[in-house]
UniProtKB/Swiss-Prot annotation:
<dbReference type="InterPro" id="IPR000597">
    <property type="entry name" value="Ribosomal_uL3"/>
</dbReference>
<dbReference type="GO" id="GO:0003735">
    <property type="term" value="F:structural constituent of ribosome"/>
</dbReference>
<keyword id="KW-0687">Ribonucleoprotein</keyword>
<comment type="similarity">
    <text>Belongs to the universal ribosomal protein uL3 family.</text>
</comment>
<dbReference type="InterPro" id="IPR019926">
    <property type="entry name" value="Ribosomal_uL3_CS"/>
</dbReference>
<dbReference type="GO" id="GO:0006412">
    <property type="term" value="P:translation"/>
</dbReference>
<keyword id="KW-0689">Ribosomal protein</keyword>
<comment type="subunit">
    <text>Part of the 50S ribosomal subunit. Forms a cluster with proteins L14 and L19.</text>
</comment>
<keyword id="KW-0699">rRNA-binding</keyword>
<dbReference type="Pfam" id="PF00297">
    <property type="entry name" value="Ribosomal_L3"/>
</dbReference>
<keyword id="KW-0694">RNA-binding</keyword>
<protein>
    <recommendedName>
        <fullName>Large ribosomal subunit protein uL3</fullName>
    </recommendedName>
</protein>
<comment type="function">
    <text>One of the primary rRNA binding proteins, it binds directly near the 3'-end of the 23S rRNA, where it nucleates assembly of the 50S subunit.</text>
</comment>
<dbReference type="InterPro" id="IPR009000">
    <property type="entry name" value="Transl_B-barrel_sf"/>
</dbReference>
<dbReference type="InterPro" id="IPR019927">
    <property type="entry name" value="Ribosomal_uL3_bac/org-type"/>
</dbReference>
<dbReference type="GO" id="GO:0022625">
    <property type="term" value="C:cytosolic large ribosomal subunit"/>
</dbReference>
<dbReference type="GO" id="GO:0019843">
    <property type="term" value="F:rRNA binding"/>
</dbReference>
Amino acid sequence: MARKGILGTKLGMTQVFDENNRVVPVTVVKAGPNVVTRIRTPEQDGYSAVQLAYGEISPRKVNKPVTGQYAAAGINPRRFLAELRLDNPDAAAEYQVGQELTAEIFTDGSYVDVTGTSKGKGFAGTMKRHGFRGQGASHGAQAVHRRPGSIGGCATPARVFKGTRMAGRMGNDRVTVQNLLVHKVDTENGVLLIKGAVPGRTGGLVMVRSAVKRGEK
C-alpha cells in the first residue's frame, strides 16, 4: 500500500466530544478533491512520486508551461500543484492519471503529518523569535532589557558565526507537525477533523500525509 497524501485547506479550529464525553480540540481541514496529473517513476524521473492538483482557478491565469502539463493529462487547470513522494517504487501502480482523491483515503484513528506555511510575524527580536531570556530588569541595566547580548568576540574569532541567533523576520516558513490523530473523517463534506493544531492561517494550503514515523500506509 502506498503512502497516502492529499492537499487541502485549513478552515479553522473547533472542539468536539469523544465517546467518553471529553472535549477534543480539532482543526477542520477541507481535504481535496485532488486530481492525479502525473506519475513519476524511477526509470523515467529517478524517483517515485505522484503529482497532485487542487483548487479552482481561471485558465487564463495559468502560464503556458503549466497549461501544457494539464493539457497532456487531459485535466482542467488547478490552482495548486504538489508532489507526493512514494516510499515504495511499486506504489505508483496504485495511481492513475485523472484519478480523483478525496478525504476517504484516511480513516478515523489514523495518524498523519501535516505540512503548511506558518503565520508571518514580521520583524521580531530575539526574545520572541528564539526565546532568549533577556537581561536583568534592574541593577544597572539601562535600555538593554530585551537586547540579545554579545554576538562574538572582537579579536577572536573576529567574526560572527553562521547561524548565530539574532533578530529578523519570523514566521512564514514551511512547517510540518507530525503524528497528529485523525479524530473523524466526514466523507459527506470532504472534511478531516485532526486533533490539535496544524500550521498556517485559516484558509491556508496544507498537505496531509500518512505519518511516516508510525509507518502509516
